[in-house]
Amino acid sequence: MRIKEHLKQLKPYQPGKPIEAVKSEYGLDKVVKLASNENPYGCSEAAKEALHHEIQQLALYPDGYSAALRTRLSKHLNVSETSLIFGNGSDEIIQIICRAFLNNKTNTITAAPTFPQYKHNAVIEGAEVREIALRPDGSHDLDAMLEAIDEQTQVVWICSPNNPTGTYTSEGELLAFLERVPSRVLVVLDEAYYEYVTAEDYPETVPLLSKYSNLMILRTFSKAYGLAALRVGYGIADENLIRQIEPAREPFNTSRLGQAAAIAALDDQAFIASCVEQNNAGLQQYYDFAKTHGLKCYPSQTNFVLIDFKRPADELFQALLEKGYIVRSGNALGFPTSLRITIGTKEQNEEILAILAEIL
């Protein structure tokens, strides 16, 4: 048996240790996970109620077209129903795009470091991946990304806000880029953390779709909406583009539970507003800590922060793990002396920052 040669350069995704495993290994009664940018406040009570009803239908396949969710989301976004595509998390939309556009005669352009699934899925399809270094402030260098485009370029990925830095692409920068990028090149704007954004110069991206038919926006219910376990993501784009990539989507790819919970979550925007308010207060806790200790902290438009501790990240990761706090070492993210920490509740933030102060 022979697998694709280019698959040999990839490694399977390595998730962090489960909470129960950490408890057992270190003899801990309490473990707090601040590694995967999950919502520390859970999800809307309305979503939980929707799950109680839908769980009675587990013997039935889900609606493969996600019709009810499609209708509700199209109204929320003020877009046509046919301009939406749904995935098993926005990760699957990334996979669909790569399946539809990339092969061994094409290339794709990403920032670096950024969300790794763009590169991972492109490599699976045999495409060349051109990685453009982030600017010193942690944001995308769109001018350099534009210069990297050639006749074989199919897709350009913009992660905004960017994971793992939390930085964003401003309205002016994005518009200037879209005006200059060839119309034959698909621009994918990954807005997984969109709901957390508060920057005044962040672009209203959905209205741009009417002008730029080569733009696609990705969003998810996994972050602010707190439905990570149910895996519901979506893409928004020109109807013709959606129609062309739909054949690459697997049937029944979002569950009955996920669709029902997502609909209910959309109807509870008060929950989102509350989460964003508390997240902003939590971000300030980390900014104050970094300033007090003279550490670089990237200004974030997300529910996580990236802090440079000026020492090996894996050592800090292990020290926190032994204290019952799971974070993400920057060593695997392209920042070997930094930690990426999910913003928790006020109490969780206070506790982990106190531990970090002791370690420093």
UniProtKB/Swiss-Prot annotation:
UniProt-listed Enzyme Commission number(s): 2.6.1.9
**Which controlled-vocabulary keywords does the entry list?**
Amino-acid biosynthesis, Aminotransferase, Histidine biosynthesis, Pyridoxal phosphate, Transferase
Q: Which reaction does it catalyse?
A: L-histidinol phosphate + 2-oxoglutarate = 3-(imidazol-4-yl)-2-oxopropyl phosphate + L-glutamate
Residues annotated as transmembrane: none
UniProt keyword Hydrolase, yes or no: no
**MF terms (GO), sorted A to Z:** histidinol-phosphate transaminase activity; pyridoxal phosphate binding
Family membership: Belongs to the class-II pyridoxal-phosphate-dependent aminotransferase family. Histidinol-phosphate aminotransferase subfamily.
What does the subunit section of this Swiss-Prot or TrEMBL entry state?
A: Homodimer.
**What is this protein's name?**
Histidinol-phosphate aminotransferase
- Tell me what organism the protein belongs to: Bacillus subtilis subsp. natto
